[in-house]
């Protein structure tokens, strides 16, 4: 596990909204810079505290085997949402990165709830704030994300991603729940956050 600079984002404070050009860079640059940013869907959301990077050369990426109807959005322009169903149960949301055709994306794994918390509690059917968005399926349910959001731009309603304020202390480690390229240290998180899906070691 590696760590970078120390400083914490202020939960609830919003930086300027990110535009699509922010995502037109290497997935390995975008992923850590999303830590501390705020993801909102129709005003409901929170601070991003955990993400995973998936590059098109990565055997664990959905795009690794080529374009299909399911992953077509990954091959499109950067700055759009790629939504898929995991294990036939949970929706997961990714942000498409790099140049069109590069087919790389960042999976949003966990949020610290800050906006519309009561709406999240109603959707999730629980009160514990720490459990509302501590996993990709949980956060998608809490924010009301479904396949209807697949292919939508991230810089226009219902989405908004606001730039982080300050430079958070970021930790890295191997990704979770995959069997291919499981040792790649492409999982990024906010150091010390109790809202991540699984603690970093």
Curated annotation (Swiss-Prot):
Its EC number is 3.2.2.-. The keyword Nucleotidyltransferase does not apply. Coiled coil: none annotated. It holds the Pfam family Pur_DNA_glyco. One of its GO terms (biological process) is base-excision repair. InterPro entries: Formyl_transferase-like_C_sf (IPR011034), MPG (IPR003180), MPG_sf (IPR036995). Keywords: DNA damage, DNA repair, Hydrolase. It is an enzyme of class 3 (hydrolase). One of its GO terms (molecular function) is alkylbase DNA N-glycosylase activity. The keyword Kinase does not apply. Belongs to the DNA glycosylase MPG family. This is Putative 3-methyladenine DNA glycosylase.
């Amino acid at each position: 596990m590696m760590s970078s600079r120390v400083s914490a984002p202020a939960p609830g404070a919003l930086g300027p909204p990110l535009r699509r050009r922010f995502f037109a860079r290497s997935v390995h640059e975008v992923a850590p810079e999303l830590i501390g940013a705020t993801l909102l869907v129709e005003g409901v959301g929170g601070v991003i505290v955990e993400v995973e990077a998936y590059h098109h050369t990565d055997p664990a990426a959905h795009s690794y085997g080529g374009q299909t109807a399911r992953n077509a959005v990954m091959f499109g322009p950067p700055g759009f949402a790629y939504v898929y169903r995991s294990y036939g149960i949970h929706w997961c949301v990714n942000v498409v990165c790099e140049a069109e055709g590069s087919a790389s994306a960042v999976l949003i794994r966990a949020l610290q709830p800050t906006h519309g918390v009561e709406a999240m509690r109603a959707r999730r059917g629980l009160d514990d704030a720490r459990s509302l968005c501590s996993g990709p399926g949980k956060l998608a349910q809490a924010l009301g994300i479904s396949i209807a959001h697949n292919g939508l731009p991230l810089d226009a309603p219902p989405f908004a991603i606001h730039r982080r304020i300050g430079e958070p202390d970021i930790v890295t480690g191997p990704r979770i729940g995959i069997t291919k390229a499981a040792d790649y240290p492409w999982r990024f998180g906010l150091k010390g956050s109790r809202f991540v899906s699984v603690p970093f070691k």
